[in-house]
């Protein structure tokens, strides 16, 4: 058998998920995330992150989630700072910039953003005719396979709050990061240290 690690969605669902779907297949539920199963899932997530006040939405994919989060959080003249290798800068076919929000990709040696890299972008964008950086986008795990430690995320969070920037964590590979032996972050840490994040594979 050949195993492909190209992505986390090349196969169907786990047999237990398929079984649960079969058991509820003939239930009649409201659409648009207004069903009891979605409500239950949201409650489980709130418990896991320790935030009863969390606003949770079910979105169909990573690009759509990135697009919604960034376009809802930013004003038309504001921009998002990310690693040069960041998914929104490289792989989403201009989806973010199509909404009018400039993506400010910063060169990094390891795909990780730091306060110093963010400060460089802030220092460069001071002219009144330039976009105003208002959000920092990070991925965990990153597009090059590195991960943020709790200390690194705490430093980013403190810096962003000091500078009045939103911190958004792309969780397309969050499942891999959270289960990695090298990781020391929990979902509760991420919920506490970021303004927006999502849970992917």
What are these language model-derived features?
Residues 1-201:
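Conserved PLP-enzyme active-site core in the AAT-like
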């Amino acid at each position: 058998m050949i195993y492909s690690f190209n992505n986390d969605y090349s196969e169907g669902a786990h047999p237990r998920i398929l079984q649960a779907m079969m058991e509820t297949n003939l239930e009649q539920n409201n659409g648009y995330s207004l069903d009891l199963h979605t409500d239950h899932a949201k409650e489980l997530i709130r418990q896991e992150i320790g935030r009863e006040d969390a606003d949770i939405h079910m979105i169909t994919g990573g690009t759509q989630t990135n697009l919604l989060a960034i376009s809802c959080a930013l004003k038309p003249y504001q921009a998002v700072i990310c690693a040069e290798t960041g998914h929104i800068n490289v792989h989403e076919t201009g989806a973010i910039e199509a909404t009018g929000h400039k993506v400010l990709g910063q060169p990094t040696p390891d795909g990780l953003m730091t306060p110093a890299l963010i400060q460089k972008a802030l220092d460069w964008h001071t002219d009144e005719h330039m976009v105003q950086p208002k959000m920092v986008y990070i991925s965990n795990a990153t597009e090059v396979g590195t991960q943020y430690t709790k200390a690194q995320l705490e430093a980013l969070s403190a810096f962003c709050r000091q500078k009045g920037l939103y911190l958004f964590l792309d969780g397309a590979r969050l499942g891999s990061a959270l289960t990695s032996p090298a990781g020391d972050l929990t979902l509760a840490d991420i919920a506490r240290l970021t303004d927006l994040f999502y849970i992917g594979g």
